[in-house]
């Protein structure tokens, strides 16, 4: 949204900065940081109040989880996704479809997690939604996003894979690009899901991933 302020610029004032992605990326970083500082405690306190005993602990996990994680509220992803969504809508360009694709995928997988956590609390067990259902929904979200990307891309690039570091290297995967992209999206989402529950929960891998993006 703030990107449009650059239209007020005469070329030599502060409004001109909003056209540069580096400036807006820095602004998004500090906005997310401020969002976390301002809302983390109120949201955590609200979750603790509503959930009382916290999330149900899995029986097949480490023994110390039963004592260390007891009373820990679930649904903390609301804070992470809220921070990401707020800073994105504030600093990103609305005319770029990739922004909306990323937001769609993030909200889609976030909704799966929210429903899963809600199911655990409602049924008072650690099972939540079955893994098969989560995986199937995740594949549909990833497939839709992949086809969306292909539709908006130049036909000569729509099935091509860029190789990091090597600027001019493009691997044309053909139709294999679709299952490959779906696998990467679903695999990335589930790697965070599998990491969640260990020390540090999901926030550290999410932070490390989002900082470089």
Predicted regions and their residues:
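"…together with the soluble PPM/PP2C metallo-phosphatase catalytic core" -> "…together
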Residues: 2-211
